[in-house]
């Protein structure tokens, strides 16, 4: 699952956001997505917890550890299939997810 020491070695990174002065001019996405390489690095932070509370606590039962591992390994199509196996609308539910 991910990189065994990834949680320690790789600092958590959130997407940047456009400044408010820019985003008030339009109704588009204001988060600036991370590059694919950075998303993959973030996937390496997933630990083999034994009891993945991220998954058991997920209201839509996403298989988060498997998904993160596939992202870490750049297996994007498989990661998408795993995510869509439990969640038809990840782009919506991801915005209201209670986890940071």
Region locations from a protein language model:
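Ferredoxin-type iron-sulfur electron-transfer modules and their immediate structural context
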Residues: 1-100
């Amino acid at each position: 699952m991910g990189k065994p020491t990834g949680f320690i070695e790789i600092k958590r990174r959130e997407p940047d956001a456009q400044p408010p002065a820019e985003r008030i001019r339009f109704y588009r996405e204001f988060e600036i997505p991370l590059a694919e390489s950075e998303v993959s690095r973030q996937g390496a932070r997933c630990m083999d917890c034994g009891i993945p509370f991220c998954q058991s606590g997920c209201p839509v039962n996403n298989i988060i550890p498997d998904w993160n591992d596939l992202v870490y390994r750049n297996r994007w199509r498989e990661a998408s299939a795993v995510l869509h196996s439990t969640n038809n609308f990840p782009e919506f539910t991801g915005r209201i997810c209670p986890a940071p």
